[in-house]
C-alpha cells in the first residue's frame, strides 16, 4: 500500500480546493439536518446521504493522499455516481420546504452534488485528456517529488507490445545452429550439391563469434523531445530495459510513438517509460 502523504493534497490546488469545499458542504448539510430533525419531521433518506458522502470524502482523501488515483479511478467514479444520486434526491426532498434548516441542509447537498460532478469528470477521464493534464500540471511545480514512494499499476493500460521497441537482428553462427542441418541430400543448400566435398564444411564457412546474442534494446543517439512525469514510476525489476522516475521529473525522449517511449534521465540513465505517465513539454 503506498504511503499516505498530506503534501499530495496540500500541494495540489485542485485536490485541496475540491476536498475543502466538499468538507464545508458536508458540515452545512450535517448541521442543517440535525436542526431540521429536532424542529420538524426530517426524511430519513437524507441521513443516508449524509453518512454515505462522508465515507466518499474520506475515500477521496485517502486515494489522492496516497497518489493512487490511477489505480482506483474506476471505483471512485462508481462511488461518486451513487453519491450524486443520493445527494440530488436529498435536495429534491428538502429544498422546497419552508423551514430554513431544511433549506440550509439542501444547500449543503447542492454543493456536494456539484463537487461530485466535478470529481466524476476528473477521475473518469484518462490521464492523457487535455483538461486533466492541465489540472495535473498545476501541482507539478508545487509537489515535486512527493509521490516518490507511490507506484501506480503499470498494467493499467496494457502490456508492452514487443514491436514498440526496435532491436537489432541477431546473427547466429553455424556452431550455434549445430544440430539443425539436414542430413538428406537436397540441392540448393550452401554446402553444395549432393556428393560435394564441401557438403559437411558448413561450420568453416562462418567465422566464430565470441559475443553471445544480446537481449538489450539498442539505445538511440538523439533525444529531440522533452517530457515531464505526471506520475511516479518504479521500473519492473525483471525488465532491465525499464527506468524509474519521480513525479515532476523531466526526461528526454527519442521517440513518441507507441505506448512505451525510449527516454533518458538527467543522470544519463536510459530505458523505456510508459507514455501515459508522461506529458510532452
From Swiss-Prot:
Its main location: membrane. It comes from the Eukaryota. The chain crosses the membrane at residues 15-35, 45-65, 75-95, 104-124. One of its GO terms (cellular component) is plasma membrane. GO terms for biological process: regulation of actin filament polymerization. Keywords: Cell membrane, Membrane, SH3 domain, Stress response, Transmembrane, Transmembrane helix. It is found in: Cell membrane. Residues 201-219 have a biased composition (Polar residues). Residues 1-14, 66-74, 125-281 are cytoplasmic. Residues 36-44, 96-103 are extracellular. PANTHER family: FCH AND DOUBLE SH3 DOMAINS PROTEIN, HIGH OSMOLARITY SIGNALING PROTEIN SHO1. Plasma membrane osmosensor that activates the high osmolarity glycerol (HOG) MAPK signaling pathway in response to high osmolarity. This is High osmolarity signaling protein sho1. The lineage of its organism: Eukaryota, Fungi, Dikarya, Ascomycota, Pezizomycotina. The gene is sho1.
